[in-house]
Amino acid sequence: MATNDAVLKRLEQKGAEADQIIEYLKQQVALLKEKAILQATMREEKKLRVENAKLKKEIEELKQELILAEIHNGVEQVRVRLSTPLQTNCTASESVVQSPSVATTASPATKEQIKAGEEKKVKEKTEKKGEKKEKQQSAAASTDSKPIDASRLDLRIGCIVTAKKHPDADSLYVEEVDVGEAAPRTVVSGLVNHVPLEQMQNRMVVLLCNLKPAKMRGVLSQAMVMCASSPEKVEILAPPNGSVPGDRITFDAFPGEPDKELNPKKKIWEQIQPDLHTNAECVATYKGAPFEVKGKGVCRAQTMANSGIK
């Protein structure tokens, strides 16, 4: 009977993990769809810009042809301004002869001005695009240049205000956790088989706050409760005495500011997590550096030494 219970518990845990994987895959598919739509839109925009440029060029050429045709037919070009006023003793025939002459000499200049103006606009647009692209590349480079270590994690002290069973999953709790923000965060944890519900209430915990929010069986989870973990046992990490919600956990050997949100595509959490362990004194560490709340102490597991943390 005990064996059946253990198998059932493992199956429920595997089910919860499978749900997380499915939700993650759904998010990746949605991102790929958005990227494909964006690329198609950009291609269409580029095509339309090329067509617009061709149309503008054709319009200007037709304008010049119209001006020349009017000149040949003796139509005076009203918009052409003469550099010197006509003498009053000019005959009508002289005026007709002079007007085409002036218009003919002015039209190439007008064409060059229009062409120069369009070239200037194209150049300005190209420069603006170049500047924007450089800024985007610079921002991406600054993020990529940050070392992949525990300083990227937004680890904070939280207090579980309420905890209850997930309505659609027997192995999951749904908690409302105070992390020092204006409103509590909703957190879904697979701790039903390891921590009694009454021990979850008003409990101080360590939270990872910058994972991308993900739905777990229909409930959006906005953080993760950090635990010492092994295949047989799980213990919630305990903050040092005197900690309050919102206190930041730092690592002396790994200074730096945490990411606003860990990029799931870059697998930052997945690269850091294998180096999170409790030491022989049950203190939570990253590559030997303790989880520390400045001026208050370190975080630790109750009994689990030399265990992984997740």
From Swiss-Prot:
Residues 92-110 have a biased composition (Polar residues). Residues 6-46 are annotated as: Required for fibroblast proliferation. Gene3D superfamilies: Nucleic acid-binding proteins. Highly expressed in salivary glands and pancreatic alpha cells in the adult (at protein level). In the embryo, expressed primarily at sites of tissue remodeling such as ganglia, developing bones and teeth. Residues 149-250 form the tRNA-binding domain. The modification N-acetylalanine is found at residue 2. InterPro entries: NA-bd_OB-fold (IPR012340), tRNA-bd_dom (IPR002547), Tyrosine-tRNA_ligase_regulator (IPR051270). Disruption phenotype: Increased Hsp90b1 surface expression, dendritic cell hyperactivation and development of lupus-like autoimmune phenotypes. Retarded growth after birth, reduced food intake, reduced plasma levels of glucose, free fatty acid, glucagon and insulin, increased glycogen content in the liver, and rapid decrease in blood glucose concentration upon fasting. One of its GO terms (biological process) is angiogenesis. GO terms for molecular function: cytokine activity; protein homodimerization activity; tRNA binding. Pfam families: tRNA_bind. It comes from the Eukaryota. Residues 115-190 are annotated as: Required for endothelial cell migration. It is found in: Nucleus; Cytoplasm, Cytosol; Secreted; Endoplasmic reticulum. Residues 54-192 are annotated as: Interaction with HSP90B1. GO terms for cellular component: aminoacyl-tRNA synthetase multienzyme complex; cell surface; cytosol; endoplasmic reticulum; extracellular space; Golgi apparatus; nucleus. The modification N6-succinyllysine is found at residue 267. Keywords: Acetylation, Angiogenesis, Apoptosis, Cytokine, Cytoplasm, Endoplasmic reticulum, Golgi apparatus, Inflammatory response, Nucleus, Phosphoprotein, Protein biosynthesis, RNA-binding, Secreted, tRNA-binding. Induction: By wounding. Residues 101-115 are annotated as: Required for endothelial cell death. Residues 92-147 are annotated as: Disordered. Cleaved by caspase-7 in response to apoptosis to produce EMAP-II. PANTHER family: AMINOACYL TRNA SYNTHASE COMPLEX-INTERACTING MULTIFUNCTIONAL PROTEIN 1, TRNA-AMINOACYLATION COFACTOR ARC1 FAMILY MEMBER. Homodimer. Part of the multisynthetase complex (MSC), a multisubunit complex that groups tRNA ligases for Arg (RARS1), Asp (DARS1), Gln (QARS1), Ile (IARS1), Leu (LARS1), Lys (KARS1), Met (MARS1) the bifunctional ligase for Glu and Pro (EPRS1) and the auxiliary subunits AIMP1/p43, AIMP2/p38 and EEF1E1/p18. Interacts (via N-terminus) with RARS1 (via N-terminus). Part of a complex composed of RARS1, QARS1 and AIMP1. Interacts (via C-terminus) with SMURF2. Interacts (via N-terminus) with HSP90B1/gp96 (via C-terminus). Interacts with PSMA7. Interacts with TARS3. Non-catalytic component of the multisynthase complex. Stimulates the catalytic activity of cytoplasmic arginyl-tRNA synthase. Binds tRNA. Possesses inflammatory cytokine activity. Negatively regulates TGF-beta signaling through stabilization of SMURF2 by binding to SMURF2 and inhibiting its SMAD7-mediated degradation. Involved in glucose homeostasis through induction of glucagon secretion at low glucose levels. Promotes dermal fibroblast proliferation and wound repair. Regulates KDELR1-mediated retention of HSP90B1/gp96 in the endoplasmic reticulum. This is Aminoacyl tRNA synthase complex-interacting multifunctional protein 1. The gene is Aimp1.
